[in-house]
From Swiss-Prot:
Keywords: NADP, Oxidoreductase. Pathway: Secondary metabolite biosynthesis. Belongs to the NmrA-type oxidoreductase family. The gene is lnaB. It comes from Aspergillus flavus (strain ATCC 200026 / FGSC A1120 / IAM 13836 / NRRL 3357 / JCM 12722 / SRRC 167). Gene3D superfamilies: NAD(P)-binding Rossmann-like Domain (3.40.50.720), UDP-galactose 4-epimerase, domain 1 (3.90.25.10). The keyword Oxidoreductase applies. This is NmrA-like family domain-containing oxidoreductase lnaB. One of its GO terms (cellular component) is nucleus. Its EC number is 1.-.-.-.
Amino acid sequence: MSPDRKLITIFGGTGKQGGSVAHSLLQNPDFRVRVITRNAQSDASRKLAALGADIAQGDGFSGDEMLSAFSGSWGAFVNINSDDKIFTTEGGPTEFDMGKIIVDSAVQAGVKHLVFSSGPPCTEMTNGRVRMKAMDMKNKIEQYARSLGSFETFTPIGAGWFLENFLGKEVAPVFGGFPYFPDDQGYLTFRVPYWGGDEHVPWLSISDDFGDIVQGIFLDPGRWNGHFVHGVSDIRSFEQVVADFAAVTGNKARFQPILPTWEAFDTHGIQELEDVKLMFGFTQLTGGRYFGPEDTEVDTARQLKQITGLKLGRPEGQHKLTSARDWFAARFAN
């Protein structure tokens, strides 16, 4: 163990993204991990503490609490929960307001390397036709952090479509029933609009890969400085992903596109599904580009996963990203 272990502090460490980052970093004896949470007594906080993480209680709107939490940190990973109810309050604070406080506090605390979970400038990329508030806010925070020039390195990362979303039985009927409930013809049918462009959907195993991708950045932060990293495990069309599922389970499954465009997607009046609908609008209007103006790519994530696997001394087979086929095989194959 290195005598000068580097402290990496995670804002949002009890969530899916931050939790994955924490679990990966805690496997590396060269790093200390601190997790900022509003509830230090939550089950998620207790589990991370049991694994060796320091738990710091703090509210993202409190500059003093953030400064204290980031104190002594070499690096930081920040993911803000866009679904926090406080951001939907009429006339209330925005995600950018919180993000600015967090970034400013990290600068004041002397954080050298910041990895920030960001998003694309949706309104700009669609000429105002699609406005995804969460993505626009994250991008605004990213641009603010870049403009400061106060970090030795700053690396934004975008998270793809979580494969783990398929584990939620309660939402499966909204998407045709796949992968749990057969339709009246006996098929497990996945019904969503087309993605757009070449149908290169960016799938991500948040639990298997995301944390390792982020750790790979911290292992050589200068190499990735300023680069927008695509958080991707596999690039597959909806039709291919359903075929992967069918191949490993033996179940009848199919993809049925919702036509003619994204606007035909029925949200059933559920706000979270309104965001999903807008996502399809965004990707259809941008030719399938989810992370920004550039095409979706997996090579960077593949390199970062391998770097982490080598550093942690994992068997060679664990240096690879998780394919959609392997993800389904591990969770749905009999």
